[in-house]
Every structure is written in C-alpha cells, then in structure tokens.
Amino acid sequence: MEQSNNDDNLLVLGIGISVHKTDGVLRFEKYCQAHNLQYMIVGEGKKWNGGNLESEAGGGQKINELLIALESIKDNKLIVVCDTYDLIPLSGPEEILRKYRFLTPDNKVVFSSELYCWPDASLVERYPKVDTKYKYLNSGAFMGYRDDIYEMIKNGVKDRDDDQLFFSIKFIETDKIVLDYKCELFQAMYRCNSDLVVHKNRIFNGYTNSYPVFAHGNGPAKKLLNHMEGYFMTEPIDGSSNTINTFKLDNEPKVFFALYVDSNDLSALKQFLGKVASIQYGNKVIYLYDRSDNEQNRKLIQISYPNYHTGVTKYVFDDFKKSDAQFYFLLEQNCIITKKDILHELIMQVKDNHRVISPMIGYEQNSTRTNFWGDIEDGYYKRSENYLDLAKHKVRGLWNVPYVYGVILMHESVVRNWDLSMVKYNDKDMDLCFSLRKHTIFMYMINNNNYGYMV
C-alpha cells in the first residue's frame, strides 16, 4: 500500500483498555484536542485482561487490541501508538512529523527509549552499543506507517504475554525498528528526574538537550508526570495576582452533601453544621454519617437531619448511588468552610479529567499544614519540592496530587462507575485516595482562593 505523506493523515492511537474511561484517558484526549491531533482510543469499553503491570510482566492485550484497530484502518498513514493512562502529548502534528522524518529518513518504526532493559535483563548484551544511557526499547510509545506496524504484530500474542518483551525481540532480531535515543519524540520518565525540568509548558531533557513531544510516566514515574502536569497546559497564576473570588452557576446540579461527624463533641458539631448551612447552594440533599453512636444525641440530631446514620467508620457511597444527585460533596467535621460560594466555584472546575477536586485549606495555627500531600512514598506522606509554594499561595491553580482530605467534590461518574471502598491502610481517607489512584482517577487540589480552615 502506498505511504501517505499528508500531515492530515497522522493518527494517534491511544491504548485505553477499560470498561469506563479513566482520568488518564480523559486527560490524554484533552491534550490531543488542544494540540490538534487526530486520535482514536483503542480498547475503549473493554475489560483489561493483560495482567497486573504494577507487579509483573504483561500487557499483550494492548497488541491484540491494536491489531483490531489497525484492521479497521485502510490507508497506509503514519500512526503514533501510545499509552493513555500515563502519557501526555505536548505538541502537534507539524513537530511530530518533522522529528519522525529526521529520526528515520527511511521510514522505519521509531520506538521510545528508556534507561532499563525490562522485563528481561538478559537481553542487555544483545542490544547495540550506543553512546547514551537511553539505550533500551520502551513499548509505551512508538510511531510508524500503518502497514509496517501491522506486519510486525499481525500474528497477535496472548493477552498476558509481555508487549515490551515482544517488541524488544523484534528490535534485536530485525532491522525494522529504530530507537529514539535522544528523546526527540518520546520521553520515558522512569528514574529520569534529574534529567527533566518543565520549561515553557514543555518537558526539557537536559541530558539529551531535547523537548520530547510525548511525556510518558512509565512505572512509578506516573507520580512525576502528574506532578508536572500543573505546569503544562497553562502557566500557574502568580500568588500576587488577583484571582476571581466570586462565582455563580446559571443552573445548580443536585449535590449530595456527605457530612462525616462525631457527635461526642457537640460544640464542634454545632460550629461545623452552622458553617455548612451558610454555604450558598439550594439544590442539595444532606446526609450525616456519625462515627459515634449516642442515643441521646441521635434523637436530637434526627430532628433537623432525618438522613442520619451512626457508628460509621468508613466513607459511604451507597446512599449517593440511590439518589439522583450529580455530585458527591464530602465534608469532615474538622474542616470549616468560610467561602460561601465554594460549590459554585468547584463545580465550574469539573470538566475533562477534573472529576475529583479538593479546595486547599490549612490549620488555623499552622497554615502550611494542609489537607493535601504533594507527593507520597510507599503510600505515605512525602513533601514535594513545590509544596510550600502551593500551601502559601505563591502559585495558584489546579494541581494533580496523590492525596486530599476533608473537603472533596466528586462527579457522579466517579462514584457510580468505580469501587472506592478498597482497603489497604484501614484509614478511610487514605483508603479512598488509594482507591482513586488504583483506578487512575486523579485528585486535583485547587488553591485559587481561601476556602476555610481545619481545626
């Protein structure tokens, strides 16, 4: 089949195998649209059967779904194949095509390179000797003509076979593949922290002196990609700049208030409920979930709050699923909201992959101790290098973070489509954030305004 050199024929095939779209896929789509990239999501609506890639080799299902997609494409066009959950495109067709033609004048398939020979380290000696540390094939992103890619994978593999091993052997045993050694097109980010900075809304690799087009947070580097995301699409707002601090929705979608309280401290409960009542939002239903079980308090509280449950130690989502509400608004008793139009502001931010949003609040006595973590290590708190800038409002915006607490707005699609009740830490807020991370549902902290405080 004749090759097409028309720029309009470039197609990005994003591998996004999932029954429901994750935030990783939604983010990928948003960036494709922003950079005028034609794209197709491969494996959309299908169950993942490719193994647990966090702990073992696997991923062969990606090859099989790609084969199905290629069979539906008749033109021999240039195609970028890439992951979606942990990958962001940062430029458009013109730069992609220019770099591809520079990397391979004879139109081979170009694969991403990385630092490690995974999953079979015994292949190291079979790789060519090159003068760079980015010397091993990474299968998370590659580019070539449709017919060449199809010929490479036409026999398929088992769903649990390893896709990276499959392509690594193809690279070693044939002359059909070249690697992007200088990270011109593709950047596999695992253990490359010291090489990478964000410059002019792009990742810059100081080791290769390049601006990669596709940023891939492979393996544990997903955290690094999510951390950098806040600097890609737009520049964060300088802390000294004025921000919009009053908001009003034209129409109020129904919000489910899930209030998690402890009636053993009645004075604190009264203060909390008083502030909740001052939130300016009409279309709502309120449920109280009390960790204590005091008969006297129960009778008193139920007079004003008929949707009241006691002895609750975990976050509850079943009541929401039975409702017709469009948003789940989680509030802990020690979080005091002072910004009365907070829901109008937060709901306006819920779009694309921003489905879980938490306004930043700090403690009265220590405002730099807040309700978010900028980083985690083994699931627990780790301070990110930009944490204090965010906590002190030196820069403002929406920030992809691994943990939020106490004030969280979630779109109904998150609560209805995903299991948010996984247990790993026996701590309800840590377990909720763990569940969201496992499903590639992003948590965004917003610090554009002052929203309240913790006690």
UniProtKB/Swiss-Prot annotation:
InterPro entries: Collagen_mod_GT25 (IPR050757). GO terms for molecular function: procollagen-lysine 5-dioxygenase activity. Pfam families: GT_PLOD. PANTHER family: PROCOLLAGEN-LYSINE,2-OXOGLUTARATE 5-DIOXYGENASE (PTHR10730:SF45), PROCOLLAGEN-LYSINE,2-OXOGLUTARATE 5-DIOXYGENASE/GLYCOSYLTRANSFERASE 25 FAMILY MEMBER (PTHR10730). This is Uncharacterized protein R699. It comes from Acanthamoeba polyphaga mimivirus.
